[in-house]
Design a protein with these regions (language model features):
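Long C-terminal interaction/binding lobes of large macromolecular proteins
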Residues: 1, 214, 234-245, 275-277, ...
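Flexible, acidic/Gly-rich N-terminal and inter-domain linker regions that tether
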Residues: 1-65, 370, 378, 386-452
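Conserved Radical SAM active-site core
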Residues: 1-68, 72-222, 226-230, 243, ...
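Flexible, glycine/charged-enriched surface loops at secondary-structure junctions
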Residues: 204-212, 254, 294-300
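Long, internal scaffold/assembly segments composed of regular secondary structure
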Residues: 233-257, 262
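Long, highly charged, low-complexity intrinsically disordered interaction regions
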Residues: 265-337, 373-422, 426, 451
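Residue-level signature of tetratricopeptide-repeat
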Residues: 353-354
């Protein structure tokens, strides 16, 4: 039976929902005369899916008919799911019609491996050429590079798309070999290096000739699945830092593994996605990108997992409490970034404003400093610090101020997303959810207070 365009869209949009490497553009180029669409740095429109994930653009697969059999993937060839494939013309027309109706502002295009990586990429390139050359589409395009694609095709794709991405998927070669035997380390990192080198060459050409063609002007990103394999948070964070430094990635996305396969090599189907762990990885990733932290400072070989109760920055501050309090009127910019409650924008405002006069609490509050957390780590004009002292009451006070409220948020939805295992166990034993949260919170407060 021949599938309608709407049937294909329903199947292939649903098949793409597990790919989270999709965000606002990061590239800026205004509309040109005679073209349709524009791409601005603030990014394309965003939408929230039913499961709470933020997605943007028309996110769809070219095909979900896959020649690979990655055990963690819903589109693997051995899985019995509805299959569909767009023709290049169908997908190009669908994108441009959605754009004209103001449904979307760009396209996120990926695909299962239809036959071979090169054949799949050639079909994706046909879509991009139709959009750019025939329909004169000037909007944002994020294209997924298929591992194993030839360098020539990747080069062509880079001049048609605003951003490219190659998904690492699993954090180690051993896990790739076990769960995705059709993929290998070389097939992933070779195109990643090629995109990095080509992007740098393109930027250098633009300094000499402003009309030189741009290669993936919004850079590249990748995605890792968290919880499908046994790698620790420390291992994942080390890998992310290495990719940022070696390949100049714009983003590393983390996706909590959602069980889709009854496979003994994977977590059981009733396993809850590790959403709190995913959340902590994003927080730590932010510290790497914007707060001048190193991966070894956030986690180390002796502590390879994130603290479930404190965010990574607060956890670092508690572990290094001897470095505090810092005088915000004298502390180096790098140290200001490490104070809980002070972000990059607030740190820059403090650095600029203190040249004119000494700052007090009122000024810090106006600059966006979160004093509820920062007060335990700073001194300033007219304020000598709200330090916990040596008593247990003081230690509990700072712990209660720093503990992550998301872990103990009330309500079934938040409980299912962020509750630590201890809360789940108490609820299963018949303890009301709110009471279970209070009990675990008090135990966590006591443990963290003793660590100060």
């Amino acid at each position: 039976m021949e599938q309608s365009l709407m049937d294909k869209l329903t199947i292939l949009a649903d098949s793409a929902k597990y790919d989270v490497a999709c965000t606002s553009s990061g590239a800026s180029h205004p509309a040109k005369r005679g073209t349709i669409g524009s791409c601005y740095a603030p990014g394309c429109c965003h939408a929230f899916t039913a499961d709470g994930r933020c997605v943007s653009l028309l996110k769809v697969l070219m095909s979900n008919c896959c020649a690979f059999d990655c055990s963690y993937c819903v589109n693997r060839k051995s899985n019995d799911v509805p299959r569909a494939t767009f023709s290049p013309r169908e997908l190009a027309e669908l994108t441009i019609e959605f754009y004209r109706r103001n449904y979307i502002e760009g396209l996120f295009l990926s695909s299962a491996v239809l036959g071979t990586p090169d054949y799949t990429t050639e079909r994706m390139l046909t879509v991009l050429r139709l959009l750019r050359n025939e329909y004169h589409f000037g909007g944002y395009i994020h294209a997924k590079t298929i591992p194993g694609t030839s360098p020539e095709l990747i080069q062509q794709m880079g001049y048609l798309a605003d951003r490219l991405s190659v998904n690492v998927e699993l954090p180690s070669e051993q896990s790739l070999h076990l769960l995705a035997p059709d993929k290998g380390r070389h097939s992933i990192f070779r195109p990643m290096k090629q995109i990095s080198v080509a992007g740098e060459e393109s930027r250098q050409e633009l300094t000499l000739y402003r009309h030189a063609p741009k290669f993936a002007p919004a850079g590249q990103s990748t995605q890792m699945i968290v919880g499908a394999s046994p790698e620790t948070d420390y291992h994942i964070l080390q890998l992310s830092e290495g990719m940022y430094q070696k390949y100049g990635l714009k983003r590393v996305f983390y996706s909590a593994y959602i069980p889709v396969s009854d496979d003994t090599r994977l977590p059981a189907l009733d396993t809850k996605p590790p959403l709190l762990r995913e959340h902590r990885l994003y927080q730590a990733d932010w510290l790497l990108r914007f707060y001048q932290f190193k991966a070894d400072e956030i986690l180390d070989k002796d502590n390879q997992s994130f603290n479930p109760y404190l965010d990574p920055k607060c956890n670092w501050a508690v572990q290094h409490y001897g470095l505090f309090p810092v005088d915000v009127n004298r502390a180096p910019f790098e140290m200001l970034l490490r104070v809980p409650g002070i972000g990059p924008n607030s740190a820059r405002r403090i650095r600029d404003a203190r040249r004119l006069s000494a700052l007090g609490l009122d000024e810090l509050k106006r600059m966006g400093v979160v004093l509820k957390r920062a007060q335990y780590f700073i001194i300033c004009r007219g304020f000598s610090g709200a330090h916990p002292g040596r008593g247990s009451a003081g230690r509990e006070r700072i712990t209660r101020a720093l503990i992550d409220p998301n872990v103990f948020s009330a309500g079934a939805e938040q409980l299912s997303m962020f509750a630590p295992p201890a809360v789940d166990r108490l609820v299963e034993q018949g303890v009301p959810p709110r009471a279970a949260q209070r009990m675990v919170r008090e135990e966590a407060v006591q443990c963290l207070a003793r660590a100060l």
